[in-house]
Amino acid sequence: MTLHLDDLRVRLLGECRYDSPFAEVLSTKRTSPHYVAEGDRVLLEDTVAMLAEHSLPSVQAPSFEAAGPRRKIYFDPARVTAGIVTCGGLCPGLNNVIRGLVQELSVHYRVKRIVGFRNGPGLTAAHRDDTVELTPEVVRDIHNLGGTILGSSRGGQDADEMVETLALHGVDVMFVIGGDGGMRAATFLSGAIRARGLDIAVIGVPKTIDNDLPFTDQSFGFQSAFARATDFISAVSVEAAASPNGVGIVKLMGRHSGFIAAYAALAANSADVVLIPEVPFALDGDDGLLAHVERLVRAKGFAVVVVAEGAGQDLFDAHGLPQLNGRGTDASGNVKLGNIGELLRTSIEAHLTAAGLAPTMRYIDPSYAIRSIPANAYDSVYCLRLAHAAVHAAMAGRTEAAVARWRRRFVHVPFSLMTRRRNQVDPDGDLWMSVLETTCQPAEFGAVAARERISSGFC
C-alpha cells in the first residue's frame, strides 16, 4: 500500500481563533529529540531505504501531523459539551482513558459538561437518555478497575440516529474509544455529521488487546494483556513438566494477529511451539506439528504449545472435526472461529496415545481473563498520554482522526487509514525471528531443521 502526503492529512473544522490554556508554556518549547513542534510532522517511514523509494523532498514525504497542545484552539472551552463512548470488547485501560479525558477537559480546558454514553447503544434513539454526567469526582478512582464504567457492546448502530443524539445533547467534541469496529463506527458517524453540516469534532482513541490496528506502535492494553497471559503459560509449563508425558496448551486471544501469543511466549520463555494466524501449519506428516510434539515429549518428557485463537482455521473440516468449527458471524460481523485449542488437544492426545506415549494433557483457555484486568503501570501512563493527545486534537478542531503513537511520537491518523488494513506479525520480521530462536521450532511445519536442536537439549 503506497501512501502519499495527502492521504495522511487530517481534516480541520476551521480556523483556530481562541487562545489555548497551554499557549504560554508552549512559547518556551524548542524542538528537540523529545518534543515535536505543532507545525512539524512525523515521518511515516523510518529507514533510509524506504524513504529513498519516494524520491521526494522531506517536506513532501509521507508524514503524520504531530499530536499535542496548540497555541490557538478552535472551540471556546466555556461553551463546549464533550461526549465519550466505549465500543467493542473490553481492554485494560479503558477506564484510564476515560479518566484522562475527563481530567484534561475539566482541569485544563475548563469544559463544564462531559456526557458519557452507556453501552454503545446509548447513542441511538431508544437509549439516548442512558447517559452519565462525568466529572473529576465521578472518575477519581476508576483507573483502578478493569472494564469500563460506561459499558460496551458490539454491533452497528444507525449513524443518523447517533448524530441526532449528539445534537440533542449539544455535543461539540466526541471521543470514540474502540477497536477496528469502533473506528469504522466513528468514520460513519463523522460522515453523517459532515452531511448535516454540524460543527462536531470526532476523535478516536484506538484500542485492541490484539494489537492489530495499523499505524500505531502498540495499542493500549496490549502490554497488560500479554503480561497476564504470561502467567497462564508459566502455570501450564509447570504442570506439563511435572506430569508424565505432559503436554500443556494455552489458547490466547488473537483473531487475525498473533502478537499476544508471540509476546507472552517470549516473556514466559518456556513455550516449545507458538502458533499464530499469520503462519500456516500442518498437523500431519513426519515434519508436521504432531510429529514435532512427539519428538519433544520423547526428548525431554513434556511439551508446551501456545496458540492464538485464529491460528489453523483451515484445519477443522480437513481433520473431521466440524463440530469445533465456527459458524456464522457475531454482532460486529466477525466470522466465528473454530476452537483451535480443542482441536490441538484432541489431535495431540490421539497422536501420542497411538505412539505409545499416553499423555497427560493440560489445557488452559484464559480468554476474557486477560482483557478484563486493570491496566498495568505501563499502560496506565500510555492511556493517560493518549487521552491528553485526544483532547488537544478535538479542542484544536481536528476531526475524523485517531490519536496514536508512531515511531515513539504521538500523531493524528485519519480514520480512513485506521480501517484500511490490519497490523499483523510479519513472518519475515524480527519479532517472529525471536520466537523461532526462543522455541527452536521450525520456521514452518514441514522443515526438519529443528530436530537436532531438540535432541541436543538446548530447547
Curated annotation (Swiss-Prot):
Query: What does the record give as the function of this protein?
Result: Catalyzes the phosphorylation of D-fructose 6-phosphate to fructose 1,6-bisphosphate by ATP, the first committing step of glycolysis.
Report quaternary structure and partners. Answer: Homodimer.
Gene (UniProt): pfkA
Q: Describe how its activity is regulated.
A: AMP causes 20-40% inhibition and diphosphate causes 20-50% inhibition. ADP, citrate, PEP and FBP have no effect.
Which positions, given as ranges, span the membrane?
none
**Cofactor names:** Mg(2+)
Protein name, as recorded: ATP-dependent 6-phosphofructokinase
Which lineage do the record's taxonomy fields give for this organism? Bacteria, Bacillati, Actinomycetota, Actinomycetes, Pseudonocardiales
Q: Where is this site: Important for substrate specificity?
A: 181
Identify its protein family.
Answer: Belongs to the phosphofructokinase type A (PFKA) family. PPi-dependent PFK group II subfamily. Atypical ATP-dependent clade 'X' sub-subfamily.
Among SUPFAM superfamilies, the record links this protein to: Phosphofructokinase
| Keyword entries, A-Z | ATP-binding, Cytoplasm, Glycolysis, Kinase, Magnesium, Metal-binding, Nucleotide-binding, Transferase
Q: Which organism is it from?
A: Amycolatopsis methanolica
Q: Which Gene Ontology terms describe the biological processes this protein takes part in?
A: fructose 6-phosphate metabolic process
Which sites bind ATP? 89, 154-155, 179-182
Reaction(s) catalysed (UniProt annotation): beta-D-fructose 6-phosphate + ATP = beta-D-fructose 1,6-bisphosphate + ADP + H(+)
The keyword Magnesium is annotated on this UniProt entry: yes
